[in-house]
């Protein structure tokens, strides 16, 4: 079933369901009691009606609207269902010739020949008429006026039946130029038979005249319709004796404007629908008309009749019909399509131009009851009584045009209709009050040009209840009364167009789904002058129509979720809100959803509460203009632009205020939100944001208080007004704050321009630790904001501030325009809180800010900050007065770049001026600043965390005062290419910040001196470089450049020192370059220092810093001698190491004065330095494989970072003030490593030497191997924490010497916090002890040998663990000791409490030592040396005594507790207690063990930064293609130390310029040390690449072509591959075959060969089968002729690749004899397709096919039959073939012809079963097939065009089949065919082809078509039919030589009765 059919059937089913309530009315009408009731009950006198039975009285009520209509409706629905079925199902469409509208005599209605027919009253009469000139009802004669049928031949438009007037009429048509329906003849135009032979398309019968006529026609010049003779006057019968000849009957069809169509040929009236007086609509119906008893009658489909007493046609061509029902009651079908039916209580008043007055009340109730019907045009009706209409009744119907109606009094309508006023041009005045409920409708006004005025009040309540419904066009409505609409009611519902509404009354609307005014029509004009109150989900005005214009001058208050003042769903409308608008509690104000609407607000709007929105601009291309003020608070939104491509103009002010909610919490709000895309928003008014919080106030916290939000994409926003923010946050309640955002821009591609500036007034109370952030502009995303105009910021805040003029991140952009002016007035609150905010903040890569305007700050304020890869520039003027702010903390960077990739540029033309009247003062440390510990210090430009700051060429920085610094970096880079002017004297400023005087301030530390540039930090936080290539001028006082710890300052430009007249200075006051706190300054070779002041000096340094001078120094314009006193500091004679060798390089340098470094360096080669090395800045890396030898001392000073060794480091001594990292595989050898301060030595590799710890803070963490080599020296001495981790080792290779330390770990300074933990292995040999401690005065500190720890002692001269006072020892691991008199653990000699605990294993001697005799004698496991010492061998402890004469315990103790295991394994003399042992011996006596506490854990190493790259590191090249060109040139990569790696290829661009199969690509790679040439490959599998190096070390590549036949792996393409190899050249075809993979080549060869182009051949075969099915399904028309057609758009007419066709099938069967017949078949199909859809395949684009068939059937007795058939099909097809691979995308067009010949012969026998209900026919036979396909040549694809020769195939198939035909009971039937058989023989010719691009070469083509399979056909059809339902199901599947086709179709037909 096609979708259209399905949709229509569903619609019909729904309609049927809705009409289910007709059934009772139909049943009531069919009651037998009807036969006893008179037909004219309504016309009977009251006394006679009283005598009627209740059934008669009841019948009209039940039957009132429905009964006699229902039959016609049901018939119509059934007809529609049938029509749908025939249209969309599978059956053919057949022409249908309607019966003649006559019985053979004169046409109806008949005339008797007289002049009049009854009934007549003397005036206008009813049919038949004589011949008067007045309008009459049928029949008419020939008058000139408009008449009703039948008409004569007048000049006016008439209604049926029509004759032949000059006006357009409805079919039958005469001979118009358009296509018409059959019959056709053989004319030149497409027609449907039968036609004569005229040139025009005509409808039968035609004569052949010059004009198109409708039969019968003579040959006259005028178009006429029957009956006509040929006379001068057109007339229609009946005619009497006039001059005209009588003509045949009129069968014209006329359609009227109110949905009535008369068909004179069928004598029917068709009604499109019936509107009822209660507003509902019935389906239409078809009724017959006739004359009965001299009166017109209408007859419904089920036989009910209506009498017609009047038929009029209005000026609007509406047919008005009225009369009486069978029961005599009045009925009318009026000009608006209403079916008006009187019941027995209805008062009926009819007649035109009458006046009716009534003050009688009305009380009517009951379904379908009607109180009064007033019918007639231009009536004047005055009704003043009260009325009550309930329970489905209709109070009054006024039907007629031009009526004037005045209605007053009180009306109550409940579930009913108050009044229906139907007709055009009516005027209605309402003066009373009306109450509507229960789904009722007060008034329906249906008609054009209606005028309505209401001065009464209305109360409408309940779902479905409606005040006024206006259905017509051009209505004019004036309402002065008040309306109340509640609970789903609707005040007014207007469906007509061009309505004008003026509402001056007040309106109250409440409750969900309640609507005051609902407009569906177009071009409405609505003026609301009254006030509106809307709540509870109600809607004030809803406009669904287009081009509506609405003006609200009254005030509107709308409240509650779901409520809305105005909703515009239509398009191109306009609305003006001139009154005030109040939106609260989640309501919406004015919403535009459609397209092209314009909303304008000139009043003031107030919006408050969450989810409340004042104005919503949704939809597309809408416009909103606001000239009034919008006040927003309490989480409301003033205006929401959620649509796209809209224009918003906001002229009034938008006031966004934070106010307290019901819980006393200050809440948020949003002024304007733009969430749609591509909108234009122009804000010409001001946006004012205000918040004022007292000390104890509470704030919501989120979301922020926001002025304008732009959240969509591609929007343009212009703010011409001012953006004003006033935030007074004095709340001191903890955690209470509410952020403020003036403009928030998210999304991408938005463009925002602020021309009026931003004004921010701010104050805060930070004592609670939280304060609101005030942001003027927030940009997130790829959008641009431009700020122009004058902006001001006044803030009283903490240091750093909480006011940000602009935050930009995530790729956004901010531009402060040339005319932008920003004035900042700031004062700081004394507090310990501070922020890192700035006036302009950028964050993230791709984010930028550019200032082109003027920024002035009165008071200290950071102006610009760039973070995390963002870039900020200044080309305008920035002026900061860093004046006293009454705060102890106000340090600031005016511009700052923080984070790698971040940069701040002071661009050409830019000026940054910094003036301070303060002096530096000590304060808390903030490490990002170069002067870490000082406040009142200010930086014009500063880089931190490895950002960059640049003062560009042409840019200027002015500095005045003490503690001011120009271009600086604590960590990062600072570059000056422009000009820096510094005057270090402290200014005195007047009230206007003019400098009145200056004075010198003596700094307490020299680094506090103002400086033009600064690099590094006063502490160990520096890692920076400052370079000057421009000009620095220092006047009176200050430094040109200063380098601090970790900083290097390099002068490559000019530094000039000057002094004002009369200014005298002192040493170190005016200096060119100063190096302090470990910094390095370098006057480079291009650097110049000009000293033009007497007290100026070139350099200054302290003892930890360095000066290097390679440049020029001039004194008063002349070169200065190095010995001149103006030199100041002396340049160092140490050598500055600026680089270390790369891999493979070696370097040796010698300096008697030593070396120093100033930045991070990495050694990858072999470096030997003869002299001391001072590392002053950055990291020092010795990388894996590298060797660094220092014949001297390496000192890692505090200004450096650390040393990280991965290679081999050999130094005489190393002293470090930073942690040191010896990483895995690293090796350090040194005599002494000195650890200074709080540093850690992480040894993960090998360490040989000694370590000295000089404080109680050093830590040593060993996970590698450590060895002390010098005799007598300890591995570690001093005070330190030591962690020997699991698997790590400590050992000594030297020997103990007298007076030596003779121990591996020597703790020489005791402290109760020091920790020693061994979890690895310590091996002490050659007389060494493992651990030795001095005596301490602290409480005992534990030393651990943990469970994984092993301590070995071999012949120690002193105890292996030799503890002093103040240490406990806990052994949880293993201790092995050997040697005479050796002691494993010895406690300190002390009266302190000391615990020596073993819960592990102590071997006194070893098992191996026992065997080889090396254990010695006199050994002790644990020995005490004090009377407070306790020895404890715990329950887990084991002591094995292997040595002779040795002991587990000994010495002086308080007690010895043994709960463990002691094994005496010696040969002799061993015991538990050594002689002389003292102390209580508790051996397994229940004494508790001492618990060893958990050992402390070692610190973690953390991460080490990435070192600088190896300059000689091979560059790994991958994913690189060497491009080649047609001229033989190629791209060249120049590189040294290059390794050619994976995926490096050479492309085949050269092939387009040469047909050579071997090509050399020269110098593809040039440089030194290039490796990996063998890795080069080709981008194409067709070419082989071989890289090689020439004599210069450059790489050439030889490209050799492979044969296609060798590369291709698909055997089906070998033939074309060989042909292409043979014809190889360099055209487009061949270059396209340079594909990347074998699979791609296989695919390309298949495509170019045409082997995959099979669809056209297959579709032709399918098309032949489709014709067979279409012909078989053709229904017979007559005499054996069958006809069937299918057209494009029908699913049955679809082939693959979006191909469709039109197909016609004709079949003529001729009975030759009683047992023989001959069938002739012909068909034609026209095809239309989109061509190929698959690469390599072809597809139909057009063409046509013809089918010829001849069948002969001979029947024999007993059901036997012999059938023979012959088919010939010819297909002339246009097609295209797609070639698409790589960069190729070609379409080759061609046309070809295919012919198909088939002969089939079969024998069959039919068996009849089940009483002829079932027929079974088995059959068998043979089929011969022959297909011929002509050759073809392609075009439009250039080198890819194929030329294909012709081909043919022949096949013989066996046929075995079975047919079933079943005709069952109850409407069921079925058919089925199952046919199959093997292919007996199949042969196919070999096709060859050639390609245009491979001239002279041909190749075989195999399309893969095969025979030999089993072919088959299966069909099934099931049918069911009943009186009102029919179902057809058909399915088929066909297969032949692998080509298949299948289909399924389901048709359902339902007839509604």
Curated annotation (Swiss-Prot):
Residues 1-27 form the signal peptide. It comes from the Bacteria. Residues 141-177, 185-249 have a biased composition (Acidic residues). Sequence repeats lie at residues 101-103, 104-113, 114-122, 123-133, 134-144, 145-155, 156-166, 167-177, 178-188, 189-199, 200-210, 211-221, 222-232, 233-243, 244-252. Residues 31-50, 88-258, 1496-1517 are annotated as: Disordered. Residues 1649-1952 form the Autotransporter domain. InterPro entries: Autotransporte_beta, Autotransporte_beta_dom_sf, BigA-like. Residues 101-252 are annotated as: 15 X 11 AA tandem repeats. This is Putative surface-exposed virulence protein BigA. The gene is bigA.
């Amino acid at each position: 079933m096609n979708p259209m059919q399905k949709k229509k059937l569903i619609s019909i089913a729904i309609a049927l369901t809705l009409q289910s309530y007709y059934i009772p009315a139909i049943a009531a009408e069919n009651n037998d009691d009807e036969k006893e009731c008179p037909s004219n009950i309504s016309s009977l006198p009251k006394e006679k009606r009283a005598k009627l039975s209740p059934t008669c009285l009841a019948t009209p009520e039940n039957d009132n609207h429905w009964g006699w209509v229902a039959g016609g409706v049901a018939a119509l629905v059934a007809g529609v269902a049938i029509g749908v079925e025939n249209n969309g199902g599978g059956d053919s469409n057949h022409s249908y010739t309607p019966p003649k509208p006559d019985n053979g005599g004169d046409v109806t209605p008949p005339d008797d020949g007289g002049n009049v027919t009854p009934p007549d009253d003397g005036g206008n009469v009813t049919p038949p008429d004589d011949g008067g000139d007045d309008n009459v009802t049928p029949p008419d004669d020939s008058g000139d006026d408009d008449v009703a049928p039948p008409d004569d031949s007048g000049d006016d438009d008439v209604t049926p039946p029509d004759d032949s007037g000059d006006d357009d009429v409805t079919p039958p048509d005469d001979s118009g130029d358009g296509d018409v329906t059959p019959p056709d003849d053989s004319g030149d135009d497409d027609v449907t038979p039968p036609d004569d032979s005229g040139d025009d398309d005509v409808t039968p019968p035609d004569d052949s005249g010059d004009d198109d006529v409708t039969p019968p026609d003579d040959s006259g010049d005028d178009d006429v319709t029957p009956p006509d003779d040929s006379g001068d006057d057109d007339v229609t019968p009946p005619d009497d004796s006039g001059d005209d000849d009588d003509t045949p009957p009129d069968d014209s069809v006329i359609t009227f404007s109110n949905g009535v169509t008369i068909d004179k040929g069928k004598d029917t009236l068709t009604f499109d629908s019936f509107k009822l007086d209660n507003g509902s609509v019935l389906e239409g119906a078809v009724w017959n008309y006739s004359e009965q008893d001299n009166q017109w009658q209408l007859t419904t489909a089920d036989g009910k009749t209506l009498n017609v007493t009047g038929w009029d046609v209005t000026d609007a061509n509406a047919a008005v019909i009225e009369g009486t029902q069978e029961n005599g009651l009045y009925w009318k079908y009026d000009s608006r399509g209403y079916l008006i039916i009187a019941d027995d209580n209805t008062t009926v008043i009819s007649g035109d131009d009458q006046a009716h007055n009534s003050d009688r009340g009305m009380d009517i109730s009951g379904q379908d009851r009607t109180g009064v019907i007033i019918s007639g045009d231009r009536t004047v009706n005055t009704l003043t009584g009260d009325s009550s209409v309930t329970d489905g009744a209709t109070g009054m119907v006024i039907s007629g045009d031009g009526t004037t109606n005045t209605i007053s009094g009180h009306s109550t309508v409940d579930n009913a209709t108050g009044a229906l006023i139907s007709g055009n041009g009516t005027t209605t005045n309402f003066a009373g009050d009306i109450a509507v409920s229960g789904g009722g409708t007060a008034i329906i006004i249906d008609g054009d040009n209606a005028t309505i005025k209401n001065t009464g009040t209305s109360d409408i309540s309940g779902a479905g209840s409606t005040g006024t419904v206006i259905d017509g066009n051009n209505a004019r409505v004036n309402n002065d009364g008040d309306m109340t609409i509640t609970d789903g009611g609707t005040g007014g519902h207007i469906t007509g167009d061009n309505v004008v509404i003026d509402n001056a009354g007040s309106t109250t609307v409440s409750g969900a789904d309640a609507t005051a005014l609902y407009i569906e029509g177009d071009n409405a004009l609505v003026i609301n002058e009254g006030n509106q109150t809307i709540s509870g989900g109600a809607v004030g005005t809803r406009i669904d129509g287009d081009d509506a214009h609405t003006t609200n001058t009254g005030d509107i208050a709308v409240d509650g979720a779901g409520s809305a003042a105005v909703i515009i769903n239509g398009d191109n409308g306009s609305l003006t809100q001139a009154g005030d608008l109040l939106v609260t509690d989640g309501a919406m104000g004015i919403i535009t959803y459609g397209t092209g609407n314009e909303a304008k607000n000139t009043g003031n709007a107030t919006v408050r509460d969450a989810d409340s929105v004042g104005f919503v601009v949704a939809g597309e291309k809408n416009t909103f203009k606001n000239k009034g003020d919008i006040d927003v608070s309490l989480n409301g939104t003033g205006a929401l632009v959620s649509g796209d491509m809209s224009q918003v103009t906001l002229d009034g002010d938008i006031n966004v205020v934070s106010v307290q909610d019901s819980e006393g919490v200050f809440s948020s709000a949003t002024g304007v939100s733009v969430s749609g895309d591509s909108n234009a928003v122009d804000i010409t008014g001001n946006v004012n944001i205000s918040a004022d919080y007292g000390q104890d106030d509470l704030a919501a916290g989120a979301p922020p208080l926001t002025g304008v939000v732009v959240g969509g994409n591609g929007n343009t926003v212009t703010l011409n007004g001012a953006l004003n923010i006033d935030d007074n946050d004095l709340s001191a309640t903890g955690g209470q704050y509410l952020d403020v955002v003036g403009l928030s821009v998210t999304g991408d591609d938005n463009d925002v321009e602020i021309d009026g500036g931003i004004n921010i007034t701010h104050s805060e109370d930070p004592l609670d630790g939280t304060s609101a952030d005030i942001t003027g502009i927030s940009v997130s995303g790829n959008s641009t904001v431009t700020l122009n105009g004058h902006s001001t910021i006044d803030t009283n805040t903490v240091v750093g501030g909480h006011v940000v003029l602009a935050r930009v991140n995530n790729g956004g952009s901010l531009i402060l325009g040339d005319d932008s002016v920003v004035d900042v007035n700031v004062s700081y609150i004394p507090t310990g809180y501070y922020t890192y905010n700035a006036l302009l903040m950028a964050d993230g890569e791709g984010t930028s800010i550019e200032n082109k305007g003027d920024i002035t700050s009165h008071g200290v304020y950071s102006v610009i900050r760039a973070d995390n890869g963002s870039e900020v520039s200044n080309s305008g003027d920035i002026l900061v007065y860093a004046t006293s702010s009454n705060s102890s903390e106000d340090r600031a960077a005016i511009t700052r770049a923080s984070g790698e990739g971040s940069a701040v540029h002071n661009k050409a033309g830019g000026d940054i001026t910094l003036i301070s009247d303060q002096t530096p003062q000590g304060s808390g440390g903030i490490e990002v600043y170069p002067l870490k510990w000082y406040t009142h210090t200010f930086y014009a430009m500063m880089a931190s965390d490895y950002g960059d700051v640049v003062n560009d060429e042409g840019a200027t920085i002015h500095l005045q005062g003490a503690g001011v610094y120009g271009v600086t970096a604590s960590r990062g880079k600072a570059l000056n290419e422009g000009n820096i002017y510094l005057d270090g004297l402290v200014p005195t400023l007047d009230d206007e910040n003019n400098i009145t005087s200056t004075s010198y301030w003596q700094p307490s530390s020299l680094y506090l001196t103002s400086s033009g540039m600064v690099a590094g930090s006063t502490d160990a936080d520096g890692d920076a470089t400052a370079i000057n290539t421009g000009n620095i001028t220092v006047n009176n006082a200050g430094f040109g450049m200063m380098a601090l710890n970790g900083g290097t300052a390099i002068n490559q430009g000019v530094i000039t020192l000057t002094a004002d007249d009369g200014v005298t200075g002192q040493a170190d006051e005016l200096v060119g370059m100063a190096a302090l706190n470990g910094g390095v300054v370098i006057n480079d070779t291009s650097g110049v220092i000009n000293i033009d002041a007497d007290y100026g000096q070139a350099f200054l340094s302290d003892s930890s810093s360095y000066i290097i001078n390679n440049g020029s120094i001039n004194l008063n314009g002349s070169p200065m001698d190095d010995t001149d006193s103006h030199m100041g500091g002396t340049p160092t004679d140490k050598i500055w190491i600026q680089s270390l060798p790369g891999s493979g390089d070696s370097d040796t340098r010698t300096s008697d004065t030593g070396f120093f470094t100033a930045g991070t360096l990495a050694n990858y080669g072999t470096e030997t330095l003869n002299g001391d090395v001072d590392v002053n800045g950055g990291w020092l890396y010795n990388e894996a494989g590298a060797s660094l030898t220092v014949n001297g001392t390496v000192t890692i000073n505090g200004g450096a970072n650390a040393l990280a060794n991965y290679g081999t480091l050999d130094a005489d001594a190393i002293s470090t003030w930073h942690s040191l990292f010896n990483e895995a595989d690293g090796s350090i050898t040194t005599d002494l490593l000195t650890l200074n301060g709080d540093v850690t030595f992480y040894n993960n590799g090998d360490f040989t030497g000694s370590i000295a710890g000089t404080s109680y803070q050093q830590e040593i963490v060993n996970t590698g191997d450590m060895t002390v080599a010098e005799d007598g020296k300890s591995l570690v001495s001093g005070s330190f924490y030591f962690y020997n981790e699991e698997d790590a080792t400590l050992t000594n290779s030297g020997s103990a010497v007298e007076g030596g330390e003779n121990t591996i770990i020597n703790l020489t300074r005791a402290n109760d916090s020091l920790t020693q933990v061994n979890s690895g292995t310590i091996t002490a040999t050659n007389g060494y002890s493992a651990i030795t401690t001095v005596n301490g005065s602290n409480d005992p500190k534990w030393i651990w040998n943990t469970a994984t720890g092993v301590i070995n002692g071999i012949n120690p001269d002193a105890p292996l663990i030799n503890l002093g006072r103040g240490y406990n020892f806990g052994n949880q691991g293993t201790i092995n000791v050997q040697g005479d008199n050796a002691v494993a653990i010895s406690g300190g000699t002390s009266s302190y409490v000391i615990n020596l605990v073993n819960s592990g294993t102590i071997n006194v001697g070893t098992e191996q030592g026992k065997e080889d005799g090396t254990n010695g004698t006199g050994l002790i496991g644990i020995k005490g040396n004090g009377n407070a010492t306790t020895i404890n061998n715990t329950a887990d402890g084991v002591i094995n005594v292997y040595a002779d004469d040795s002991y587990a315990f000994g010495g002086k103790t308080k007690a010895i507790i043994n709960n463990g295991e002691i094994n005496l394994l010696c040969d002799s003399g061993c015991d538990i207690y050594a002689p002389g042992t003292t102390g209580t011996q508790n051996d397994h006596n229940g004494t508790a063990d001492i618990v060893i506490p958990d050992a402390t854990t070692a610190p973690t190493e953390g991460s080490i930064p990435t070192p600088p790259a190896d300059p000689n590191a091979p560059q790994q090249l991958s994913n690189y293609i060497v491009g080649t060109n047609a001229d033989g040139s190629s791209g060249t990569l120049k590189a040294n130390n290059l390794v050619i790696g994976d995926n490096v290829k050479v492309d085949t661009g050269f092939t387009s310029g040469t047909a050579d199969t071997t090509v050399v690509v020269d110098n593809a790679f040039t440089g030194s040390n290039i490796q990996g040439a063998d890795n080069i490959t080709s981008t194409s599998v067709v070419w082989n690449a071989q890289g090689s190096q020439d004599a210069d070390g450059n790489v050439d590549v030889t490209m050799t072509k492979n044969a296609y036949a060798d590369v291709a792996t698909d055997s089906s393409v070998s033939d074309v591959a060989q042909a292409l190899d043979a014809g190889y050249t360099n055209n487009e075809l061949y270059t396209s075959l340079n594909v990347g993979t074998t699979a791609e080549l296989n695919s390309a060869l298949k495509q170019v060969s045409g082997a995959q182009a099979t669809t056209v051949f297959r579709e032709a075969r399918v098309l032949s089968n489709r014709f067979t099915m279409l012909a078989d399904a053709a229904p017979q028309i007559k005499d054996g002729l069958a006809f069937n057609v299918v057209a494009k758009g029908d699913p049955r007419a679809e082939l693959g690749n979006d191909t469709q066709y039109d197909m016609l099938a004709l079949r003529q069967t001729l009975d030759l004899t009683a047992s023989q017949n001959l069938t002739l078949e012909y068909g034609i199909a026209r095809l239309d397709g989109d061509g190929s859809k698959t690469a390599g395949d072809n597809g139909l684009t057009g063409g046509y096919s013809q089918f010829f068939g001849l069948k002969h059937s001979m029947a024999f007795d007993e059901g036997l039959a012999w059938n023979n058939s012959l088919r010939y099909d010819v297909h002339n097809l246009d097609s295209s073939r797609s070639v698409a691979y790589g960069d190729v995308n070609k379409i080759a067009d061609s046309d070809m012809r295919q012919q198909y010949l088939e002969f089939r012969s079969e024998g069959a026998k039919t068996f009849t079963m089940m009483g002829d209900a079932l027929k079974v026919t088995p059959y068998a036979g043979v089929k011969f097939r022959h297909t011929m396909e002509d050759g073809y040549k392609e075009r439009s694809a250039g080198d890819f065009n194929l030329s294909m020769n012709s081909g043919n195939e022949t096949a013989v198939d066996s046929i075995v089949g079975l047919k079933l035909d079943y005709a069952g009971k109850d409407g069921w039937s079925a058919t089925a065919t199952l046919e199959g058989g093997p292919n007996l023989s199949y042969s196919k010719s070999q096709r060859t082809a050639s390609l245009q691009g491979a001239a002279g070469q041909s190749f075989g083509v195999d399309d893969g078509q095969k025979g030999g399979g089993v072919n088959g056909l299966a069909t099934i059809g099931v049918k069911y039919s009943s009186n009102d339902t029919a179902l057809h199901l058909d399915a088929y599947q066909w297969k032949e030589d692998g080509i298949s086709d299948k289909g399924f179709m389901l048709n359902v037909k339902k007839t509604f009765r």
